[in-house]
């Protein structure tokens, strides 16, 4: 799936940067364009991979480039007033080659979440492609303003997009009481980008050897995400045994004899174990698995390890766990891969625990003000 990425606010811009970095390490490309917008000049200047002419500073007449200090209403108003400026990076971009837009934003501040909703609404008005959000929950789980902003921005983003990928930052932090360094944020953003990148890159091929037996094309992802709501991503990656690096092995590959002998029981066990790790391990947004309305299983690795029977069996297992019959599967052959990865996308989830906790913090703050 080819995507055009927008980063709204500091967190959104950093996630897009990590997606671009992930793409640089992969073949083929899956990002057709990237842009960022913010009310804080320093955060835009800190970006390295998003082109300078695709970065938009807005709200400067009110903030002098210093941001809105968590005031989501002012952030939303500024984005609405200058929406044309925010969309300028799409004017000369290859939008026709894009399957979808992806708008990334942190939800707890005054710029990212409100701006992402404005961007999503305007993109939907101008273009036919679906618009997906990436909503990053704040680590400040006990801060009333952050909780209120997160709930408000999440509701708006869900209503203005075709689906929102959630990422609960606090759930990935070992000690919420300690300040998080920029390096730690980069690590978290890289993990989110790896999961999103694995999903988007799955159907993008450059050679006939990269075509899977069951291709994960853009329509498969779109169908999994249709109907709106929140989505979560599970992931597992484990190294594969090294290829034959002997002289004979290298010569065989040079003449096109690249067949790899793999024990089918071994491949089945690997896929089964990793699928369970992906579903039962740390999701980008924790939820009751049974609340998912749709799912997609993507297996990436060297072709010989992509056991179709194992993939189908584990698709059935996910159907049992979710209670949904709308679970798809696909393989993503990568002849040079040194690992086997399993990605599980669950759409239409209900993260009740997180939303209830956020609402309690927001309500407590309102009671205190009264």
Curated annotation (Swiss-Prot):
Keywords, ordered alphabetically: Cell shape, Cytoplasm, GTP-binding, Nucleotide-binding
Phenotype on disruption: Does not affect motility. No differences in growth rate or cell size.
One GO term describing the cellular component: cytoplasm
Keyword Metal-binding attached: no
Subcellular location field: Cytoplasm
Source organism, top-level taxon: Archaea
Residue spans crossing the bilayer: none
InterPro entries linked to this entry: CetZ (IPR032907), CetZ_C (IPR048737), FtsZ/CetZ (IPR045061), Tubulin/FtsZ-like_C (IPR037103), Tubulin/FtsZ_GTPase_sf (IPR036525), Tubulin_FtsZ_GTPase (IPR003008)
Positions contributing to GTP binding: 110-112, 189
The keyword NADP is assigned to this record: no
GO BP annotation list: cell division; regulation of cell shape
GO molecular function, one term: GTPase activity
Function, in words: Involved in cell shape control.
Family the entry assigns: Belongs to the CetZ family.
Record-given protein name: Tubulin-like protein CetZ6
Organism: Haloferax volcanii (strain ATCC 29605 / DSM 3757 / JCM 8879 / NBRC 14742 / NCIMB 2012 / VKM B-1768 / DS2) (Halobacterium volcanii)
């Amino acid at each position: 799936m080819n995507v055009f990425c927008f980063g709204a606010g500091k967190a959104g811009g950093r996630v897009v940067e990590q997606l671009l970095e992930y793409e640089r390490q992969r073949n083929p490309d899956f990002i057709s364009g990237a842009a960022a917008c913010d009310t804080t000049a320093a955060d835009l200047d800190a970006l390295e991979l998003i082109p300078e002419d695709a970065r938009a500073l807005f709200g400067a007449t009110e903030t002098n480039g210093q941001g809105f200090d968590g005031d989501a209403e002012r952030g939303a108003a500024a984005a609405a007033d200058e929406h044309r400026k925010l969309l300028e990076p799409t004017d000369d971009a290859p939008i026709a080659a894009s399957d979808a837009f992806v708008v990334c934003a942190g939800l707890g501040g005054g710029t990212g979440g409100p701006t992402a909703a404005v961007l999503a609404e305007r993109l939907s008005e101008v273009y036919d492609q679906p618009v997906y959000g990436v909503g990053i929950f704040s680590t400040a789980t006990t801060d009333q303003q952050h909780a209120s902003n997160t709930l408000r921005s999440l509701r708006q983003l869900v209503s203005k997009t075709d689906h929102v990928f959630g990422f609960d930052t606090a759930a990935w932090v070992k000690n919420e009481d300690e300040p998080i360094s920029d390096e730690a944020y980069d690590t978290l953003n890289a993990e989110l980008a790896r999961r999103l990148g694995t999903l988007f890159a799955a159907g993008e091929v450059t050679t006939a050897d990269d075509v899977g037996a069951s291709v994960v094309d853009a329509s498969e992802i779109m169908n999994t995400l249709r109907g709106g709501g929140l989505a979560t991503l599970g992931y597992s990656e484990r190294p594969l045994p090294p290829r034959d690096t002997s002289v004979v092995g290298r010569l065989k590959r040079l003449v096109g004899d690249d067949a790899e002998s793999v024990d089918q029981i071994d491949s089945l066990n690997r896929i089964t174990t990793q699928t369970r790790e992906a579903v039962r391990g740390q999701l980008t947004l924790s939820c009751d698995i049974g609340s998912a309305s749709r799912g997609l299983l993507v297996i990436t690795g060297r072709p010989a390890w992509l056991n179709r029977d194992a993939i189908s069996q584990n698709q059935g297992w996910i159907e049992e766990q979710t209670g949904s019959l709308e679970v798809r599967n696909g393989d993503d052959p990568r002849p040079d891969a040194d690992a086997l990865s399993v990605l599980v996308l669950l759409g239409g989830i209900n993260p009740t625990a997180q939303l209830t906790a956020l609402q309690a913090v927001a309500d407590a703050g309102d009671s205190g003000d009264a």
